Amino acid sequence: MLSVFGLRTVARCNSTLASGGARAAAAAGGKAGAQYSALPKSVHALYFQPLKLPVKHHDLVADLQLRAFDNQSLDFFANFALRVGYYLGIPMTGPKPLPTRRERWTVIRAPFAHAKSKENFERHTHKRLLRLWDANPEVVEMFLSYITKHSMAGVGMKCNMFQRESVQLAQELADVPLAPGAPQTADEVVGAKVAELMQSPEFKKHL
């Protein structure tokens, strides 16, 4: 019955087409994979979520708050900040969404003809919080200077840094000896500079 209606031939054609399609798909996938693997690791990492270093000592050194009116720009810059922190060796957590600030204004449509009709305006400020852990102040300042240099338009930043000092810090600063003869006020600085100029040989030539 199968040979009479030609079902065996149809089955053969279907299997041949399927195997050819599979080979073509495998070849295309291999070519795309070769091109994908040829990318540098730094570019390859952009297709994945940013990596994070584990927090070991739980020493909070800074809080970075990002603000913007657009969620897309805010999330993009938060992603960029996480990648910068990873390559600088800073353990970071976040971004944590903070409550959205909503502001509304009601104004008249026009000063004369439409003075009795009102118009409402609303603005939403979205926020994200990033926390930096287990890093020294120099690395944190480098991180902040880099993201400030490459900041995005429309995204604001606010950073709170935390440094731990001893209880006797004021006493230790008071005990630091000052340089002998160092001027302490602006007038003393100017006077010392004038005295230095008057003693110079170039100035004495004109006297």
UniProtKB/Swiss-Prot annotation:
Subcellular location: Mitochondrion
Transit peptide segment: 1-24
InterPro entries referenced in this protein's UniProt entry, alphabetically: Ribosomal_uS10 (IPR001848), Ribosomal_uS10_dom (IPR027486), Ribosomal_uS10_dom_sf (IPR036838)
An example molecular function term from Gene Ontology annotations: structural constituent of ribosome
GO BP terms in the entry: translation
Domain of life: Eukaryota
GO cellular component: mitochondrial small ribosomal subunit; mitochondrion; small ribosomal subunit
Record's subunit section: Part of the mitochondrial small ribosomal subunit.
Functional note: Involved in mitochondrial genome encoded proteins translation. Involved in the binding of tRNA to the ribosomes.
Similarity remark: Belongs to the universal ribosomal protein uS10 family.
Record's protein name: Small ribosomal subunit protein uS10m
Organism of provenance: Eremothecium gossypii (strain ATCC 10895 / CBS 109.51 / FGSC 9923 / NRRL Y-1056) (Yeast)
Gene from which the chain derives: RSM10
